Amino acid sequence: PPYIRFYLDIIDPNSVHGPYSQSWVDEWHRTQVSEHSYYCSDFKFRKGMVSDKNTPVYTLHMADGMWLNKSFKNSILQRIAKCELDGKRYVYSDLGFVLLQQVVEKVTELPMDLYLAREFYAPMGLQRTMFLPLTKFTKAEIMPTASNDFLRRQDICGYVHDETAACMGGVSGNAGLFSTAEEVAKVYQMLL
C-alpha cells in the first residue's frame, strides 16, 4: 500500500462518533485536512498509548507534552512487514523508506540520525541539517511545520509533520529531516 494510517491505532475507536474521517463536515467531524476530508476532533487516545510525560515507557516524543508508548514503533514495523506487495503496478509508498532506516541502523550499528550526522552532515559543514532540531535549537529558530495539527491538537514547530515519522519518535527513513535552504543547496551542489 502507498500509505498506512498507523496513528489510527492509538485512537480509541469508542471515542469517535461514526467513522474517524468522512467527506463532509458535521458536529463531530470539524477538522478539515484536505478539500473533501474532515476528521473527528473530539477523539481520545487508547489507554496506555499516550502520556503527557517522558517516562521509560513513553519515549517517542511526538509534540509538546505528547509522548507515545515506545512499543508502538515495533508495531509499525510489524504491520509493514505483513504488507503484501502488488507486483502488477508501481505505486509510490513511503513504507520502504521506513524500512530503509532499519537497514541503515542494522548495518551501521548506530541510530540513523547519529550515523548521518557523523558521516554526512558534519563533514559537509552542515550545522542545521538534522533530525530532532529541538535538541539543538529553540522554536524561535525553526520554521513551524503545521498549524493546529489534527492528531496532536497543537501547532507543530520543531517536530516532524508526517504522522508515521512522528509515531516513530521523529527519526524515520521517510520523513523528519530538518534543514535550511542554504544547506539543502550545499547537498545539491555535492550531488552535481
Role assignments for model-derived ranges:
Residues P1-L192:
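Short, surface-exposed loop or secondary-structure junction motifs
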